[in-house]
C-alpha cells in the first residue's frame, strides 16, 4: 500500500528516505519559515496519511477534525515538546501523535552545562575583543573576571532524564549537587551517584568528598551557586506544582547575588520581566537561556537591554542541535529517526493499535 506523508520541514534526507524506500509518497515543505496553516489544512484535506510536524506548526482542533474527515492516521512531531498540538482534539478524533522523548537527553544536558560555564566565565567579551581587534595587552585583573564552575554547588530542578544527565556532568566537575523534583525523587539514582563519589574520594581522585541529595526547593535556591532548570511546563490547575513562572521575583530574590540561573527547559518557567530586573539590580550574577516565553524573542523584550550583555547569554532554542541527535535515521539515536519510526509503526499497524506504539503520546485515546 502506498501512503502519502507531508513534512512541514526537512528533518533530514537519510531519515525520510526510510519512508521513500517503502514506495511511499513523501512531500517536504523545504523552507526556513514554517508553512502557513492553510497549507497544512490543504494537505490534510487532500488525503495525506501522516503529518511530520515541528513546534512551529499549530496542530489544533481544525486540523484534527479535517484529518478525521479525510485519511490522517498520525501526526509525528519532530520534537520532545508538543505545546503546539491540541491533545484533547487529538483524543476526540482518535488520531495519535508522537514525539521524540529520550533521544535528545544528553545533547540538551550537555548544552545546559556548556552555557552555564560560558556565562559564568564571561566568554563573550573575550571573543568580542578578539573579533573587534580591541585586544591590546594582557592584564590579570580585567573587569570581566569570571567565576569557576569546578567545586561549586549546583541545584538541579527536575531530575528526569535530562536532569540526571546534567548531574552526571556536574559531578565530573567536582560539583556538589542539590536535587529537587516534586513529582518523583529518584533516591536509587542519587544513592548510585553517591557511591561513585565516595569511591572517587577513597581512591584519592578528588581532594574532598562531594555531596548529592534531594532538598526542598527554596533551600536549593538559597544554597546553590548555579541553578539549572529541567522541568516540564505546567500551568496552574494542571499540576500540584505548576512550573509556569516558577522563577518569579520572590524566588529569584532567594538566590545568592553571586549565583547563576540556567534554563534549557521551557521559556515560561522563568518570568522574563522579573529576570531582567534581577540582573539589572544585582539579585543574581547572571543567566543563560536557551528558551523564552515568546519565540523568537520579541524586539521589545526586556532581556534585550544592552546593560545585560555581560550578565546574560541567550541562544535560539538550540540545545538539542547536535548533528546525530537531530538527523540520525536511527530511532535510538536521532529525533528524525524516531519521528519516521513512529510514522512507520502507525501506518503499518506494527503494534495492533496506535496506543501501543512506543513513541505515541496520547495512548489514552486508544
Give the residues covered by each predicted segment.
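Phosphate-binding beta-alpha-beta segment of Rossmann-like dinucleotide-binding domains, i.e.
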Residues: 93-95, 100-153, 351-360
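N-terminal Rossmann-fold cofactor-binding loop
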Residues: 9, 181-183
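Glycine-rich Rossmann-fold phosphate-binding loop(s) that bind the pyrophosphate
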Residues: 159-160
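Short beta-strand "acidic-cap" motif of Rossmann-like dinucleotide-binding folds
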Residues: 28, 177-179
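An N-terminal-biased, well-structured beta-alpha scaffold segment characteristic
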Residues: 1-98, 222, 248, 254
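Rossmann-like adenosine-cofactor binding region
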Residues: 59-63, 184-302
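N-terminal Rossmann-fold NAD(P) dinucleotide-binding loop
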Residues: 163-164
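Rossmann-like dinucleotide-binding domain for NAD(H)/NADP(H)
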Residues: 98, 250, 258-366
Amino acid at each position: 500500500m502506498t501512503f502519502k506523508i507531508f513534512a512541514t520541514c526537512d528533518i533530514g534526507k537519510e531519515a525520510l528516505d526510510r519512508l521513500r524506500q517503502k514506495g511511499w509518497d513523501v512531500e517536504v515543505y523545504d523552507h526556513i519559515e514554517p508553512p502557513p496553516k492553510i497549507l497544512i489544512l490543504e494537505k490534510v484535506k487532500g488525503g495525506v496519511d501522516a503529518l511530520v510536524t515541528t513546534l512551529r506548526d499549530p496542530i489544533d482542533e481544525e486540523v484534527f477534525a479535517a484529518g478525521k474527515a479525510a485519511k490522517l492516521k498520525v501526526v509525528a512531531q519532530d520534537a520532545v515538546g508538543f505545546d503546539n498540538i491540541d491533545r484533547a482534539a487529538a483524543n476526540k478524533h482518535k488520531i495519535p501523535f508522537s514525539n521524540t522523548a529520550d533521544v535528545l537527553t544528553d545533547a540538551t544536558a550537555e548544552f545546559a552545562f556548556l552555557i552555564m560555564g560560558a556565562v559564568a566565565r564571561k566568554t563573550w567579551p573575550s571573543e568580542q575583543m578578539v573579533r573587534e581587534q580591541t585586544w591590546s595587552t594582557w592584564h590579570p585583573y580585567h573587569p570581566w573576571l569570571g567565576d569557576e564552575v569546578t567545586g561549586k554547588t549546583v541545584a538541579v530542578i527536575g531530575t528526569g532524564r535530562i536532569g540526571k544527565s546534567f548531574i552526571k556532568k556536574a559531578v565530573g566537575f567536582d560539583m556538589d549537587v542539590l536535587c529537587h523534583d516534586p513529582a518523583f525523587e529518584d533516591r536509587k539514582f542519587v544513592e548510585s551517584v553517591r557511591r561513585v563519589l565516595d569511591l572517587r574520594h577513597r581512591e584519592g581522585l578528588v581532594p574532598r568528598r562531594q555531596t548529592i541529595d534531594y532538598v526542598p526547593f527554596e533551600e536549593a535556591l538559597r544554597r546553590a551557586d548555579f541553578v539549572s532548570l529541567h522541568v516540564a511546563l505546567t500551568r496552574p490547575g494542571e499540576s500540584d506544582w505548576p512550573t509556569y513562572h516558577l522563577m518569579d521575583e520572590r524566588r529569584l530574590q532567594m538566590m545568592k547575588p553571586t549565583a547563576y540561573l540556567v534554563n534549557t527547559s521551557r521559556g515560561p518557567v522563568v518570568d522574563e520581566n522579573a529576570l531582567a530586573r534581577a540582573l539589572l539590580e544585582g539579585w543574581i550574577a547572571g543567566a543563560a537561556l536557551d528558551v523564552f516565553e515568546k519565540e523568537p524573542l520579541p524586539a521589545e523584550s526586556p532581556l534585550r537591554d544592552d546593560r545585560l550583555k555581560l550578565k546574560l547569554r541567550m541562544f535560539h532554542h538550540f540545545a538539542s542541535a547536535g548533528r546525530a541527535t537531530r538527523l540520525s535515521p536511527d530511532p535510538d539515536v536521532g529525533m528524525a529517526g524516531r519521528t519516521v519510526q513512529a510514522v512507520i509503526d502507525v501506518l503499518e499497524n506494527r503494534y495492533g493499535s496506535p496506543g501501543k506504539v512506543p513513541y505515541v503520546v496520547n495512548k489514552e485515546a486508544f
